Every structure is written in structure tokens, then in C-alpha cells.
């Protein structure tokens, strides 16, 4: 069976942990992850001044699709940049239309709202993004640390990054693989 494939869209101002932890955990699970720079292949400055080098530009990564999951990290500026991107809208619409998984964390889910993705779904966000996410009544809000409703998977923030990543692994590769990946991470149960 071919490896599952993930596209992580990295925008300037993305939250570092919400980017790197899911990438690392998915790769541990054998998922082929492409970190795609929204503005190109140049290094991206994240919200806490950590610089991440994308694997590809979003334009090039899009040509290699489709992906089993599209992942949107949070960070206020990162989420704003994702929300304002026509390329992100196109990728999310294609992913939704082909019934592919879409995962977003922290402020990242606000890009779903901006691009009219997953309306009617139960979602969660960082507490400070809740009001923005609920504007217009297009979603049902959950206080869960990770919420999966059909093909929309959302999470709350940096402190839920491991749970978010493991939920993606479980959705793509099953509970057994997620448990195998989790065990050596020495996470608190």
C-alpha cells in the first residue's frame, strides 16, 4: 500500500510548534509530508522568530497533489495569511470536493471560515479565535482539545499539537499506528 501524503501549508507568522510537531509525528508514522511555503520556497519566519525551510513552494507542491490531508498551522499572522490566499482557497475547495481530510489548529481554522470550508461542522480553535470562528453561525463550537467531525479535524493550540498530530495519524493510518507512534514520545496520558 502506498504511503499516505500530507500537505502542510506554511505561511509567514505560523506557530512553530503547530507546524513542526505535526510534521514530525506524521513522518514518524510513515506519512510523506510536504511542507509548502505559501510565499515560495524561501525560509519562513514564524510567530516566535523560528525560521523553517519549506520543502517546496505551494505552487510546486500543488502540482504533486492530491494529498490525503491538508494541514493548516495556527499563529495569528499565519492564519491571516492563509485566510487571504486565493491559492489556499483553491487547495481547500479541491480537498473538500474530493472528500479529503482537512486539519487546522489554533487560529488556523479561521482560514476554513474565510474560504467557506466545512460549513455545518463541529470545530474547535484557540480560545481567542472562538468569536471570529463563530461569526456567521456556520459552525458548532466544541471546547474539546481535538475535534474531528467528518473530514474536518481541528484543535486548540500549541499545547494540543501532539494530540492534533496523533489524531491526523489515526485518521490516515489507524489507531494501531497512532499508538505505535505515541508510545516512544513519552506523552502524558
From Swiss-Prot:
Lipid attachment in record (S-palmitoyl cysteine): 46, 53, 106
Modified residues (N6-acetyllysine): 148
Swiss-Prot/TrEMBL keywords: Acetylation, Autophagy, Cell membrane, Chaperone, Copper, Cytoplasm, Disease variant, DNA damage, DNA repair, Endoplasmic reticulum, Fertilization, Hydrolase, Inflammatory response, Isopeptide bond, Lipoprotein, Membrane, Mitochondrion, Neurodegeneration, Nucleus, Oxidation, Palmitate, Parkinson disease, Parkinsonism, Phosphoprotein, Protease, RNA-binding, Stress response, Tumor suppressor, Ubl conjugation, Zymogen
Residues carrying N-acetylalanine: 2
Domain of life: Eukaryota
Keyword Nucleotidyltransferase (UniProt): no
Phenotype for residue 18 to Q: Strongly decreases enzymatic activity
Family: Belongs to the peptidase C56 family.
Protein's UniProt name: Parkinson disease protein 7
Organism: Homo sapiens
Gene behind the chain: PARK7
